[in-house]
Each structure stands twice: as C-alpha cells, then as structure tokens.
C-alpha cells in the first residue's frame, strides 16, 4: 500500500507576516495599537502586551536587526487586505477588442445598427476594430471604403479616439477605435 505524499511533508508555511509565536527575534521594536512607538523590548514582553490588549503581535518589518512589530487584530487586517484586493480587481476591467464587420456599400439603416453597437461597446469600455471587407470588383473602389471609415471616425470623434488609422490589408481595410 502506497503512502500519501502529504503525510510526511512538512506543514505548509502560511503566506504573509509572522504573528505571535512565529516571530523569531529576541528583541523587537514595538508599536502599540494606537500607533505609538514603545521602544525596543524583549519578545516575551511584547507578546504579553499584545495578549493584555487581546490582540495579535504582527511582524511589520523583518529585514532589520530588531524587527518592527505592531499590536493589532490580525483577522481584521487580513479581512481589510482581502477587501482591498477585491476592490482593485473589480476596478481593473480589462478592455476587450470587439470587431464590427461592414461592407463598402452598406445601407443607411444597417450603418445605424452597426453605429449603435459601436457606441454600446464604447460605453462598456471596449476597443472596437472596424473591418471593411471588399469583394470582387469592389477593390477598384477603395476610396469608397476609405470614405466610409472616415465617416465612422467623424461620427465617433467625441466618444472615441483613433488608435490605429485605416489601412488596407489584402482585401480588407481595418481601423481600431478606443473609448476616450
């Protein structure tokens, strides 16, 4: 019968600062729960002060000869850190690149529908790549495609900026707009 590998593995070290008995220094610089510096003292005295306040002793700065420790509620600290990370993650919305495909001889109503879709993408904070595809003899009238992309650029000049100017790649013309 095979043994489970985690049975003989050492216990996992928790990430984050050392707290209470995990602190390894003999003398520490103590900062109390009010943020006032209490001075250098033995670790045992600092632990007693933390227990007296019914809080934890947390190692704030471990790099020095006498590490800086602070008396605070570690559970509350972790909760607030998690909350900050979640808020930062929520704020950091990644901008997607949405694509709108059109043809050079697009009808007015079809253009309006595409324009509404582009406006919605800008409201959501997404970039828009407009792809204008030419077929057959339409390649002879590339100026019509350029005029159409210029019209799109003019229609959205208040809400978007041109990130990539219109350019011809094979049988299609592309332009990228980003929200302002």
UniProtKB/Swiss-Prot annotation:
The keyword Ion transport does not apply. SUPFAM superfamilies: Translation initiation factor IF3, C-terminal domain, Translation initiation factor IF3, N-terminal domain. It is found in: Cytoplasm. Pfam families: IF3_C (PF00707), IF3_N (PF05198). Gene3D superfamilies: Translation initiation factor 3 (IF-3), C-terminal domain, Translation initiation factor 3 (IF-3), N-terminal domain. It comes from the Bacteria. GO terms for molecular function: ribosome binding; translation initiation factor activity. Belongs to the IF-3 family. PANTHER family: TRANSLATION INITIATION FACTOR IF-3, TRANSLATION INITIATION FACTOR IF-3, MITOCHONDRIAL. This is Translation initiation factor IF-3. It comes from Hyphomonas neptunium (strain ATCC 15444). The lineage of its organism: Bacteria, Pseudomonadati, Pseudomonadota, Alphaproteobacteria, Hyphomonadales. The gene is infC.
